[in-house]
Amino acid sequence: MVSVANTQLKIATFNLFNYLEPPNAYYDFERIYSAEQWAKKQKWITEYLREYQPDIIGFQEVFSPESLKELVATQGYHYFAFVDQPEVIDDFIYRSPVVAIASRYPIVDVAAVTANTKLAQTLGLVDDFSFSRKVVRATIEAPHIGNCDCYVVHFKSKRSMIEVDEINNEWSPEKVIIESLKASVAGGWGATIQRGSEAALLMIEMIERREATNNPMLLIGDFNNTLTDGVLNHLLTSTLRFVSTIDRDAYLAKYCLNDAWNLFEVSLTNEGNEGNEENETSRKVIAKRAPTHYFGTSSSVLDYVLLSCEFDASYHDSLYQVSGYDTYDRHLINPIFDRDGESTDHGIVLITLTLRS
């Protein structure tokens, strides 16, 4: 039985960046952690868990799920689930890492989410459309709120789906550039179609599951895209055109998702309106959302936690509100090799949910 004494619930999304136990290699035969590097990576992970104490964690880039299961168990996460295995392309060379979820609270059901292939065909996608990485749905018995469906994703990356074979073609330098450009345009768009389709078809499955169970929903993961550029913004659909307004908003609230950051901003605004000087200071300090990924001189938010209305303080029947939002990025903006040399290339997003009084 889950204790109702707990008034807070912490949720994290954590891209582990090639979590593969040696002597196996990721992608290439030379990419193998030494014993020292592996110990360093595991220590970095456990130190984060020990310091920030998330209750539920969605992991991405997991090549060694059994090893990860053992590691997090040492930190009190006795419930762990995954629904797929990485691909082995040689005796010891791995690719296609999987996602996983760890929880301090009981996982009572686990499933791999599958796309509605008939709907995929209607959208003009291939007949056997599937997620580039299988999506985990774990139903967790959380305090106060009961069974909660937690989805962990790692949507298709922006990497081009078309590779140029320069080696086996005797091309001029100009021809190489032309073919690379064509591959980049077409292959990049192909990746975008896959990523956006994954999000849309997952959302359909989440809505149908919600209709059947009425379980609260959390969507956790590395989206490989910002939520605001149009490719994934249907995950936050909150309006419908040409639909009767009678009961519309109430139904939409039940089936739609909210970005945890936006809910956190609302809670800060509400606290600020109370005139508390300390709250006003915290609003100014946390005025801008921190990026979770850096590439060259650019940065973006790629890692998200989305929540159903039970976690939205503005919803009349909500049980929790988002009281904290932290992006752990010290290893990205001020790395120290001895400490962060085997960390990750993503920031770790952690949200704190507090029971409403």
PLM feature segments, named:
Residues 153-183:
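A structural motif
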Residues 185-213:
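A long, amphipathic alpha-helix that forms part
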Residues 62-160:
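Structured beta-strand-rich core segments of catalytic domains in phosphoester-bond hydrolases
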Residues 1, 112, 121-124, 128-131, ...:
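Metal-dependent phosphoester-hydrolase catalytic domains
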Residues 1-97, 176-179, 214, 333-347, ...:
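N-terminal, active-site-proximal structural segment of metallo-dependent hydrolase catalytic domains
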Residues 19-24, 159-161, 314-315:
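Short, solvent-exposed loop/turn elements at domain surfaces
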Residues 8-21, 147-156, 180-188:
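Active-site-proximal beta-strand elements of phosphoester/diester hydrolases
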Residues 14, 60, 153, 221-222:
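Active-site flanking residues adjacent to catalytic metal/cofactor-binding acidic residues
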